Amino acid sequence: MDLPAPIHDFLLVFLGLGLIVGGLGVVLLTNPIYSAFSLGLVLVCISLFHIPANSHFVAAAQLLIYVGAINVLIVFAVMFMNGSEYYNDFHLWTVGDGVTSLVCTSIFVSLITTISDTSWYGIIWTTRSNQIIEQDLINKGQQLGIHLSTDFFLPFELISIILLVALIGAIAMARQ
């Protein structure tokens, strides 16, 4: 996707803020369900980073695999656990929390300085799918990826939503 530079920068900043907010939600929220949903936000933002880089199939695959499978599995596992054990013995701040905050803050600052010093416009990300087809360099796996991300995208997404609804219904019936 060839976006103008200001829109590209805004999109990257917006997705980066989504990553930061979601990561803070995973770490700071005491309810494990809310933490799992924050993890879902992080995984969605990570997969959306591939769209400006013309890697639409990678974005869709990561969205389906990580958000559609891994995060749903985490939510179901948390739903089956006893929720009362998370609220006992809640300490406001410990030494381990301080050390972890210091390490994470230093890693965050080093990443921010590295990202701001990198020239992102000189990087060649990927080729477009129509150029790959024209070069006749594709194998069966690449053809499948191209068709799933173009021709069969809507049916593929609808099947995944139907499977998700069936899983949620099965879990709800099993809990009763």
Swiss-Prot record:
EC top class named in words: translocase
Q: Does the keyword Thylakoid apply?
A: yes
Indicate how the chain sits in the lipid bilayer. Answer: Multi-pass membrane protein
Q: Under the cellular component aspect of Gene Ontology, which terms does the record hold?
A: chloroplast thylakoid membrane
Q: What's in the keyword line of the UniProt record?
A: Chloroplast, Membrane, NAD, NADP, Plastid, Plastoquinone, Quinone, Thylakoid, Translocase, Transmembrane, Transmembrane helix, Transport
Where does this polypeptide localize? Answer: Plastid, Chloroplast thylakoid membrane
Its EC number is: 7.1.1.-
Reaction(s) catalysed (UniProt annotation): a plastoquinone + NADH + (n+1) H(+)(in) = a plastoquinol + NAD(+) + n H(+)(out); a plastoquinone + NADPH + (n+1) H(+)(in) = a plastoquinol + NADP(+) + n H(+)(out)
Q: Name one GO molecular function term.
A: NADH dehydrogenase (ubiquinone) activity
Q: Kindly give the InterPro entries that the UniProt entry links to this protein.
A: NAD(P)H-Q_Oxidoreduct_6, NADH_UbQ/plastoQ_OxRdtase_su6, Nuo/plastoQ_OxRdtase_6_NuoJ
Q: Which residues cross the membrane?
A: 10-30, 33-53, 61-81, 92-112, 152-172
* Function comment: NDH shuttles electrons from NAD(P)H:plastoquinone, via FMN and iron-sulfur (Fe-S) centers, to quinones in the photosynthetic chain and possibly in a chloroplast respiratory chain. The immediate electron acceptor for the enzyme in this species is believed to be plastoquinone. Couples the redox reaction to proton translocation, and thus conserves the redox energy in a proton gradient.
Q: How does it assemble?
A: NDH is composed of at least 16 different subunits, 5 of which are encoded in the nucleus.
Name the family the entry cites.
Answer: Belongs to the complex I subunit 6 family.
Provide the protein name. Answer: NAD(P)H-quinone oxidoreductase subunit 6, chloroplastic
Name the source organism: Nandina domestica
Gene that codes for this?
A: ndhG
